[in-house]
Amino acid sequence: MNNDQRLERQSRIRNFSIIAHIDHGKSTLADRILERTGALTDREMKEQALDAMDLERERGITIKLNAVQLKYKAKDGNEYIFHLIDTPGHVDFTYEVSRSLAACEGALLIVDSAQGIEAQTLANVYLALDNDLEILPVINKIDLPSAEPERVKKEVEDVIGLDASDAVLASAKNGIGIEDILEQVVEKVPAPAGDPTAPLKALIFDSLYDPYRGVIAYIRIVEGTVRPGEKIRMMQTGKEFEVNEVGVFTPKAVKCEELTVGDVGFLTAAIKNVSDSRVGDTITSAVNPAQEALPGYRRMNPMVYCGLYPIDTNDYNDLREALERLELNDASLQYEPETSQALGFGFRCGFLGLLHMEIIQERIEREFGISLITTAPSVIYHVTLTDGNTIQIDNPTNMPDPQKMDHVEEPYVKSTVMVPNDYVGAVMELCQSKRGIFVDMQYLDENRVQIIYEIPLSEIVYDFFDQLKSNTKGYASFDYELIGYRQSKLVKMDILLNGEKVDALSVIVHRDSAYERGKVIVEKLKELIPRQQFEVPVQASIGTKIIARSTIKAIRKNVLAKCYGGDISRKRKLLEKQKEGKKRMKAVGNVEIPQEAFMAVLRMDDK
């Protein structure tokens, strides 16, 4: 292809993504667009065509990004090349959204015409605005009896400040308005800018591991051209590779001769390790490198940590392999080996948030068949010691002695809750109970309110989201962003079973709520740990001070069963003998802890 042809083709490329809150019909709309542009035959067409993982289909959410190239013949007679990038809508995956948005020039903003704007819609719109994208509002689900498209249009204008006068009214389920959406993409989304003859610059926005071809990098070409056989360099890591093949997704991977400015496709180059093709990194030519990398790359830092241990200790190496494999596709997963007296060998893993953590656990159990025990999730605390040094703690067991600590800081988040008028009280009560600090409250229209609180992340990590949903009958939507660290009165609470500390059950709690938490946890463990042949005390302690206790009663065999009547001293002798045996057992006895016990430490809501 000569340069003029490249430039002509470039003017017909439109790169866009779809952003929406969970369940507003994003993947369904993507299905309709694939259908309308003839990307899939009827036989291949299935619900959520771009969601490849079983888990995505089951939960009805999008976890990984997907990119497709589509051909569309517009009303002006030209054939346009669309690159549609489907993004996750969940708050844990915002960084995947931000990367896919960086690969686009435009975004379709989908708003449910019955529910209106939700908290994550806002979060994603701000990400799109940060990337200077052209945003096209689409009011979806207009076939619902409860749809109020005019109200929602007004909301889009008032809350986001977008002009919604020519927003497309659509129903992705029934295929209404799809044509209008595609025409708007042609008219309003700008063609990619960039020089095909300049040194190569390509943004990696996702990577995937294939056992035969190594790492497959999903890329968007910003400048220059790339062909098989060329040498490339990763600008963050400085490593060099030779390109084996380049191609596009239609949604199936199809090889092509070259990728040039504006193309969204894939590249393989015998890259063995996914950490060599970091998401957000820039690929350039090794022979004629670009001067500077594309902006916006940042390493994703985990927000939530927890321990993963195999139930069967022989599975340890399989678990390591599973984590290595998942890490290949998931740049934000971090892990390191750790040991626990109670659980043996395992890994301390870092995740972006709770949904991310659940999904990784579920994928390990499903795809690799390993049964797991997970410990309570915790966040990263900054501990300043009396000698002036600051250390970071992501595991409660590593918390230093109270005498050595000067103060502890914990991460705070700014949480935005959008909720119908009737539930404002319930939401405020919940936020207050989680040590929230009230910031602001705004009425979006006559019956929807946006409430902003600053809450410690550790309070959100447990069950904030579940409680929020149940307190508002599922109507609230929620989004959070980290705002920094603040000093708090935090203490480490240990749980003792039979006088032994169980390291995996330790939690870091606020001093004011320690007594309450201790009492609840101890009672819960009493119910969940099976009764032993001997009496087991369950205690919660802060340092050496016991703050709560409960006792699991022993199971007792009736040793008097075969004494019919008879002398009392004979019975007493048997009972004394039994008592001696129990005492001996108690001294050497080990208590098995079921998985539910670890989760009980977290779930404080069903007191």
From Swiss-Prot:
It is a peripheral membrane protein. Signal peptide: none annotated. InterPro entries: EF-4, EFG_III/V, EFG_V-like, EFTu-like_2, G_TR_CS, LepA_C_sf, LepA_CTD, LepA_IV. The keyword Cell membrane applies. It is found in: Cell membrane. Its EC number is 3.6.5.n1. Pfam families: EFG_C (PF00679), GTP_EFTU (PF00009), GTP_EFTU_D2 (PF03144), LepA_C (PF06421). GO terms for biological process: positive regulation of translation. Belongs to the TRAFAC class translation factor GTPase superfamily. Classic translation factor GTPase family. LepA subfamily. This is Elongation factor 4. It comes from Shouchella clausii (strain KSM-K16) (Alkalihalobacillus clausii). The lineage of its organism: Bacteria, Bacillati, Bacillota, Bacilli, Bacillales.
